[in-house]
């Protein structure tokens, strides 16, 4: 089912992009610019579990390759398609507290209990991008949005207490606030992730040097890392994350038009 959903999202997006660019070609100023480069940044993620698991933001790094094809300028909007192939470390970090909002102290270690799951993905977003401002020299503001797919490469756990000696959630109100702990021993069941991403950023362009971009990006996962049928423990287990990224692009091909600024 996941692969079918991925296919539907990708096909719908490609059809929309082709229709969009075709319509622009009839009324817009033609461009045929192609740029490549690399990106890197900081990513903050969590998982929307149902039933709920109290969490803090999981933090990690992301980086990879970026490709951009600029096709048109429609009135004042510069239109492009952007693709990336990224390596990203995401996951979840549990907020283990008592009902009084105090850290849960493990009886064996004497330390506040901590649990974190690191998940390493290859992420492939494809964006429709619109920018306003200078293309060759100066500043441009842009927005972009589109589907994103992810492929799980590996997972690892960070835990500072013996699992069989963990603090439970007791009926008298002591121990953990949440008794939901099934996820701590469950490996990821669905290796493919998919969803929708959108970003807002600013670009600085310099002739013969390239393009530098700063972007804030939000991602909402439409898939679940665990099964969500009636017999499964979780009804939902999808990603949300926020990334702050820097990107550098250099031009491979540029449209010959002295009017382009």
Question: Predicted regions span which residues?
Answer:
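Short loop/turn motifs that connect adjacent beta-strands in outer-membrane beta-barrel proteins
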Residues: 26-33, 72-79, 133-140, 206-211, ...
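Predominantly the C-terminal beta-signal and adjacent terminal strand-loop region
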Residues: 193, 201-261
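Extracellular/periplasm-exposed beta-strand and loop segments of Gram-negative cell-envelope proteins
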Residues: 46-58, 90-121, 152-193, 224-241
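Residues on the lipid-exposed face of transmembrane beta-strands in outer-membrane beta-barrel proteins
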Residues: 38-42, 63-71, 87, 124-132, ...
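Short glycine/proline- and aromatic-enriched beta-strand/turn motifs that initiate or cap beta-hairpins
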Residues: 25-68, 189, 261
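Acidic/histidine-enriched, beta-strand-rich ligand/metal-binding domains
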Residues: 79, 88-92, 119-120, 130-142, ...
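Transmembrane beta-barrel architecture of outer-membrane proteins
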Residues: 58-64, 78-80, 119-125, 140-142, ...
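Bacterial Sec-dependent N-terminal signal peptides
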Residues: 1-31, 39, 246-250
């Amino acid at each position: 089912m996941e692969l079918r959903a991925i296919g539907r999202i990708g096909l719908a997006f490609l059809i929309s992009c082709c229709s969009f660019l075709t319509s622009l070609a009839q009324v817009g100023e033609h461009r045929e610019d192609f740029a490549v480069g690399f990106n890197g940044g900081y990513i903050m993620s969590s998982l929307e579990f149902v039933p709920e698991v109290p969490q803090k933001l999981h933090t990690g790094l992301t980086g990879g390759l970026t490709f951009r094809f600029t096709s048109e300028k429609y009135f004042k909007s510069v239109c492009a398609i952007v693709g990336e192939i990224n390596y990203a470390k995401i996951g979840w970090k549990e907020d283990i507290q008592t009902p009084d909002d105090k850290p849960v102290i493990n009886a064996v270690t004497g330390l506040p209990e901590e649990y974190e799951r690191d998940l390493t993905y290859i992420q492939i977003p494809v964006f429709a991008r619109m920018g306003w401002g200078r293309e060759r020299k100066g500043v441009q503001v842009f927005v972009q949005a589109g589907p994103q797919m992810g492929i799980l490469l590996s997972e690892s756990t960070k835990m500072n207490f013996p699992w069989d000696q963990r603090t439970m959630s007791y009926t008298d109100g002591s121990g953990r606030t949440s008794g939901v702990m099934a996820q701590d021993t469950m490996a990821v069941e669905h290796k493919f992730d998919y969803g929708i991403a959108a970003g807002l950023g600013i670009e600085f362009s310099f002739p013969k040097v390239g393009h530098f971009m700063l972007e804030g990006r939000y991602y909402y996962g439409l898939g679940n890392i665990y099964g969500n049928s009636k017999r499964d423990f979780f009804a939902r287990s999808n990603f949300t994350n926020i990334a702050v990224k820097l990107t550098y692009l250099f031009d491979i091909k540029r449209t010959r038009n002295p009017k382009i600024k």
